[in-house]
């Protein structure tokens, strides 16, 4: 029996106030309006950004809110004017939209669509939500809210993927994998035969290593204080792994010595502001490129010795790996389907949506790299 045009009652993981655990709630999901798509979720990945945001007091005005921003699903129905997807299509959710019309989208050098401005409202459109919980307007984290059985999302924030795509694994491509892999491929432009150092070995850091390997790097040194992550790092392509706590001298000096005046490319993936200067100092003094991949809070000020730039180092940022999302994320899914890379080492746990708090705790404790939730 078709549900198109009808309100769908289903379950979602809802945050009622920052710092509280998520609760499974019944929600009502209204039909999509113009340029909107209603998606039956198949899988959702938990990203470190989700976990950081759970305790962020700035999220309070947007509660109740459905968390999650990585996901895949099947189109249940579409609103008027939708042309890029249709009912029954397999899709991936895009936490960074691509409208295809703004100056940024039309510029080949940029990927941060101007419609990303809605992300801070946590609404799918200007001032509106298609979801309610206990009669209250319910927000969707970064306009997505993938920890739900159904969501309504703007057409520019969803992309069709191949019919044979394995949605239960491909869900992490929408943010975590794309962010790390693209930081190496697009943002740093790692070159064949180069040397790389990656600081932080979570899911995104491991994806950076995979990107460095795919680009042909000759030497990839993984850096983390948790040695339990080293085996996985080597599985995805690290040639060496080091723990800064094992050395008496600063880790940047260790890497400088190991790589003949520093690495060609370094990546900061911990989200720790102090590590940014360390990563910058670890890259080659003349031509080294350091990419900030880890998410830093907007109020954090970086304190970096200006002399590090004197001889030619470059420090740059990277958002979602530099991908034009609606165009290029589906291509990554196709590459995964074609076995050009393997996501299995990244997905260490798969749980049902009602176990979301257990999954979050596993990630907080460092026992899990990436967890996939199945509604």
Swiss-Prot record:
GO process annotations (BP): retinoic acid metabolic process; retinol metabolic process
Subunit structure comment from the entry: Dimer.
Record bears the keyword NAD: yes
Binding site for Zn(2+) 1: 47, 69, 175
Cofactor: Zn(2+)
PROSITE patterns given in the database record: ADH_ZINC
CC annotations in GO: cytosol
Binding annotation for NAD(+): 200-205, 224, 229, 293-295, 370
Reactions listed under catalytic activity: a primary alcohol + NAD(+) = an aldehyde + NADH + H(+); a secondary alcohol + NAD(+) = a ketone + NADH + H(+)
Domain of life the protein comes from: Eukaryota
Binding positions (Zn(2+) 2): 99, 102, 105, 113
Keywords from the named record: Cytoplasm, Metal-binding, NAD, Oxidoreductase, Zinc
Organism: Peromyscus maniculatus (North American deer mouse)
SUPFAM superfamilies attached to this UniProt entry: GroES-like, NAD(P)-binding Rossmann-fold domains
Task performed by this protein: Alcohol dehydrogenase. Catalyzes the NAD-dependent oxidation of primary alcohols to the corresponding aldehydes. Oxidizes secondary alcohols to the corresponding ketones.
Protein name per the record: Alcohol dehydrogenase 6
């Amino acid at each position: 029996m078709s549900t198109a045009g009808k309100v769908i009652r289903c379950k979602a993981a809802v945050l009622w106030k920052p710092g509280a655990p998520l609760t499974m709630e019944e929600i009502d999901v209204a039909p999509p309006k113009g340029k909107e798509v209603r998606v039956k979720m198949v899988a959702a990945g938990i990203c470190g950004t989700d976990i950081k945001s759970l305790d962020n007091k700035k999220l309070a005005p947007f509660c109740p809110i459905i968390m999650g921003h990585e996901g895949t699903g099947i189109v249940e129905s579409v609103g008027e004017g939708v042309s890029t997807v249709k009912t029954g299509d397999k899709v991936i959710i895009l936490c960074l939209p691509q409208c295809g019309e703004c100056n940024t989208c039309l510029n080949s050098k940029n990927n941060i669509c101007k419609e990303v401005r809605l992300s801070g409202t946590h609404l799918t459109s200007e001032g509106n939500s298609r979801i309610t919980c206990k009669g209250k307007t319910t927000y969707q984290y970064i306009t997505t809210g993938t920890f739900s059985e159904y969501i309504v999302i703007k057409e520019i924030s969803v992309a069709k993927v191949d019919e044979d795509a394995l949605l239960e694994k491909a869900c992490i491509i929408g943010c975590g994998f794309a962010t790390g892999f693209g930081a190496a491929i697009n943002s740093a432009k790692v070159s064949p035969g180069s040397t790389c150092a990656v600081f932080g070995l979570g899911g995104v850091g491991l994806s950076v290593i995979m990107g460095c390997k795919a680009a042909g790097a000759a030497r990839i040194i993984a850096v983390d204080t948790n040695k339990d992550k080293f085996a996985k790092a080597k599985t995805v392509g690290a040639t060496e792994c080091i723990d800064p706590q094992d050395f008496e001298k600063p880790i940047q000096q260790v890497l400088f010595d190991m790589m003949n005046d520093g690495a060609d490319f370094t990546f900061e993936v911990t989200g720790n502001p102090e590590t940014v200067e360390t990563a910058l100092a670890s890259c080659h003094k003349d031509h080294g490129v350091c990419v900030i991949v880890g998410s830093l809070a907007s109020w954090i000020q970086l304190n970096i010795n200006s002399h590090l730039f004197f001889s030619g180092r470059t420090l740059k940022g990277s958002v979602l790996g530099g991908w034009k999302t609606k165009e290029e994320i589906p291509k990554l899914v196709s590459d995964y389907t074609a076995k050009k890379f393997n996501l299995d080492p990244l997905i260490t746990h798969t749980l049902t949506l009602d176990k979301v708090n257990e999954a979050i705790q596993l990630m907080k404790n460092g026992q899990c790299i990436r967890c996939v939730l199945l509604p």
